[in-house]
Amino acid sequence: MIRWLIIFLFPMILFADSFNDYLKLIQTKNLGPLGNHQQGEIEILIKEPLIQKAQTDTEKRLLKKGVASKLAEEWSRVGIIAEDSYLYWIRDAVIFPSGIYGTYDRILWKSCVEGPPGIAIAPIIHKKILVNLNYRHATRSWEIELPRGIRNPHETLLKACERELYEETGYSLKNHLLLGTIAVDSGILSSLVPIVYCHIEKPTERHSDFSEAISDNIALTLEELEHALLQGCCTVATPKRTVQAHVRDPFLAYALLQIKLRRLLSAPLLD
């Protein structure tokens, strides 16, 4: 009898621990406020009776849509749905500005719990912007992009900038200016990524991670990049290959606009 009781209760204990981890995670300062639905915001619920109501209401809506009972229960479950070494997929119980209870999913970079999740860099060399010719697994295509990457645990923003710049281009950072932050997809991603404008020097060999597919670094003028952005793609010929690369990087588009509006390329060198 005791054996079967342990078998029955053990998954419940594991779920309770996981749910407590979730509640602690969503109240981390860097993930933003819980919100107030009475002020027109989507409010995250942390009291268990309200969370249960949000789950139940969501499950009922799914059942009305014809979703199978087991899936409806699974798809309405609040908490940490999945995680790996890089990401959390979480589902929050919320109350919408309409007063209706429900759930809402978010994807979090784990590095954003203690600070900025990563860094994007607009490196300047001889008044040109250095970009990566990068093959991306997610899009299954060649892309023209700014150098960027995740921030390591306990790493400052400046250290992350210096490391990513060195790894992806081989250059050293001379001086820098924070252009701002970008929300890549505010509908699902919680992470806000800073973009840094910098002058670079002392080129060496790239030291890319084994999982990266950066073919080349290319220095282009602001006008060349604006034209490529308007076209949506460009033909890139390098000593290694000639490819048709897409030009649609949101980090690059944001940086180009900031650089142009601030007239940074015509300004004196940064101090």
Tell where the protein language model's regions lie, with residue ranges.
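Classical Sec-dependent N-terminal signal peptides that target proteins to the secretory pathway
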Residues: 1-16
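Nudix hydrolase/Nudix homology domain
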Residues: 17-57, 68, 139-142, 153, ...
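N-terminal positively charged helical leader segments and presequences
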Residues: 43-87
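Conserved Nudix-box catalytic region and its N-terminal flanking loop in Nudix hydrolases
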Residues: 45, 107-163, 183
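Short acidic/polar mixed-charge low-complexity motifs
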Residues: 71, 98-100, 128
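Acidic, metal-coordinating catalytic segment for phosphate/diphosphate chemistry
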Residues: 76-120
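Active-site-adjacent beta-strand/loop module that shapes the phosphate/pyrophosphate-binding cleft
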Residues: 94-98, 185-205
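The catalytic Nudix box helix
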Residues: 131, 145-181, 196, 207-213, ...
